[in-house]
């Protein structure tokens, strides 16, 4: 609606930056929290933020700061949900099936990342954006209801407070000791920062420069 590459870039930055910053520390807390509750409340928080986005769009608010704030809040919820989900897999799966299930999990996740934009782009043609957001809310609520039916074993609680410096140092040493991991991590980070602004321009190139339509 605003036809502003800057606005879209800022929205994507608002969705990425909290994960980049908080992701360094989220795992420290997730390892000490109840995984099931962490995922449950993260999903509820994401659903609440998405519902607020639905209301903001439906009411016709034009102040983009609302969108940036709610997008950043959704990103914060995802920052804690993702490591809690990954940390729950070893608690649910027998050790001899762990490699196979982990591979299936990442395959499904990769498939979702590919198919979701296709489905989303198709829905944009037929539905207003606010109703597409409602689908996301329904999905988050369904995930919460599913979690209520799943029993995730709890780890023994510890009273030791997180030592960020120690754990980050151990993480850094592990990255350096494992051959190929550190260069891969650096390359992935650099590629993400370089390509993200470029990807945001593709819709505008299609609509404004090539005079395409939403479906294209």
Where are these regions (language model features)?
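Helix-to-coil boundary motifs at intracellular loop junctions of multi-pass secondary transporters
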Residues: 1-2, 32, 88-92, 205-210
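Loop-to-transmembrane helix entry
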Residues: 4-14, 209-216
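Primarily residues marking transmembrane-helix entry/exit sites
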Residues: 5, 64, 68, 167, ...
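Substrate-agnostic recognition of the 12-TM MFS/MFS-like secondary transporter fold
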Residues: 12-30, 34-49, 66-125, 135, ...
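Juxtamembrane intracellular "pre-TM" segments in multi-pass secondary transporters
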Residues: 152-186
